[in-house]
Amino acid sequence: MEHTFIMIKPDGVQRGLVGEIIGRFEKKGFSLKGLKLLTVDQAFAEKHYADLSAKPFFNGLVEYIISGPVVAMVWEGKNVVTTGRKIIGATNPAESAPGTIRGDFAIDIGRNVIHGSDAVESAKKEIALWFPEGVANWSSSLHPWIYE
């Protein structure tokens, strides 16, 4: 099964959207494998967003991520990276469809509530960074009702 990294950003935590977001992934049929509520320091945020370090918005993004607690999660499921991105919606909330997390809960790109891995390889890298101790090894009893 595929894994993805999902992070509820400080605005999502402050606005009380954690349960709603987890519920959307669970209702889809994905399995939660790892979960942490934490605050990160600047060095860690810079490492997470290293691929964006040359972008003009990089410093603001780092400040935003360290401004409050985040919820870091690992989800498992068939095509979870691609499907997770569809659940989240476009990076720019103005381009996100209603029914997506960003389409329903975000207005500005700089406060877009949630991060999700954009590819299987980036998911592996992000999971290794955020969950160096690994994740829970369990299988949902619902798998036969979700997967062929």
Swiss-Prot record:
GO biological process: CTP biosynthetic process; GTP biosynthetic process; UTP biosynthetic process
Catalytic activity: a 2'-deoxyribonucleoside 5'-diphosphate + ATP = a 2'-deoxyribonucleoside 5'-triphosphate + ADP; a ribonucleoside 5'-diphosphate + ATP = a ribonucleoside 5'-triphosphate + ADP
Keywords for the protein's UniProt record, in alphabetical order: ATP-binding, Kinase, Magnesium, Metal-binding, Nucleotide metabolism, Nucleotide-binding, Phosphoprotein, Transferase
Enzyme Commission number, as recorded: 2.7.4.6
Cofactor (UniProt): Mg(2+)
Residues binding ATP: K9, F57, R85, T91, R102, N112
An example molecular function term from Gene Ontology annotations: metal ion binding
Active site: H115 (pros-phosphohistidine intermediate)
SUPFAM superfamilies: Nucleoside diphosphate kinase, NDK (SSF54919)
Class of the enzyme per the UniProt entry, highest EC level: transferase
InterPro entries named in the record: NDK-like_dom, NDK-like_dom_sf, Nucleoside_diP_kinase, Nucleoside_diP_kinase_AS
Cited Gene3D superfamilies: Nucleoside diphosphate kinase-like domain (3.30.70.141)
Protein family (similarity comment): Belongs to the NDK family.
Protein purpose: Major role in the synthesis of nucleoside triphosphates other than ATP. The ATP gamma phosphate is transferred to the NDP beta phosphate via a ping-pong mechanism, using a phosphorylated active-site intermediate.
PANTHER family, alphabetized: NUCLEOSIDE DIPHOSPHATE KINASE
Name of the molecule in the record: Nucleoside diphosphate kinase B
Source organism of this protein record: Flaveria bidentis
